[in-house]
Design a protein with these regions (language model features):
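Conserved structural-core and active-site-/substrate-pathway-adjacent residues in large, well-folded domains
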Residues: 36-41, 86, 128, 156
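Conserved N-terminal subdomain of the carbohydrate kinase-like
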Residues: 1-37
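Conserved phosphate/ATP/ADP-binding segment of small-molecule kinases
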Residues: 44-138
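Conserved post-catalytic alpha-helical subdomain immediately downstream of the catalytic base
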Residues: 117, 144-174
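Fold-independent oxyanion-binding glycine-rich loops
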Residues: 4-7, 39-41, 69-70, 87, ...
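Short, charged, surface-exposed secondary-structure boundary motifs
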Residues: 13, 92-95, 148-152
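A polyampholytic, Gly/Pro-enriched intrinsically disordered region
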Residues: 1-10, 84-93, 170
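Glycine/charged-rich beta-loop-alpha catalytic/anionic-binding loops adjacent to active sites
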Residues: 135-147
Length: 174
């Protein structure tokens, strides 16, 4: 199999960003969701203006925001209910290799700095780490090693699953 992607990643202009924000505002007003997932692929849709507007609308409407970030906007999601980077993304943000001995503290510092209630770090075959309630509780979630042909979409699956769990008012650690 072979895959080749050719694409341009550029920020939405202010007119398109404003139109997107209007659509999101309309959906919130009419559908009254209790959760929003922001899946940021670093393709230019999630501009500072869009991110700030979505977070503000969510806050005003008591909506939990779940974020799967990418590198460019990593520090723009202040106040998110759950922040789910992968190991490489968090390591790149910190500018160092992740160390199991300091990981809990690194995650907690990030949560405090950006007002992130829950931090879920995916680590591939090492499983996941969940830091809840602004770093008060810390859990290592082991993975079950399996033969996997392709990990494409694994992060999307994780954020979607955790969002459904929270929307159903199930405790995250369970």
């Amino acid at each position: 199999l072979f895959r080749a992607d050719y694409e341009d990643a550029f920020d939405l202009d202010s007119r398109d960003a404003s139109r997107l924000i209007d659509v999101i505002e309309n959906v919130i007003a009419n559908r009254k969701p209790n959760v929003i997932i922001i899946q940021d692929y670093d393709k230019g849709v999630m501009t500072n203006e869009v991110i700030a507007s979505v977070l503000n609308l969510a806050d005003k409407n008591n909506i939990k925001v779940f974020v799967d970030p990418k590198k460019r906007n990593f520090d723009k999601y202040q106040g998110a209910f759950l922040f789910k980077p992968n190991e490489k993304e968090f390591s790149d943000y910190l500018g160092k290799k992740l160390d199991d001995d300091t990981l809990e503290e690194d995650m907690k510092k990030f949560q405090e700095k950006f007002n992130i209630r829950n931090f879920l770090l995916t680590r591939g075959e090492k499983g996941m780490v969940l830091s809840e309630n602004f770093g008060e509780e810390y859990y290592v979630i082991p993975s079950e090693v399996r033969s996997i042909a392709d990990v494409t979409g694994a992060g999307d699956t994780v954020i979607s699953t955790f969002t459904v769990i929270c929307a159903a008012d199930v405790d995250l650690k369970n």
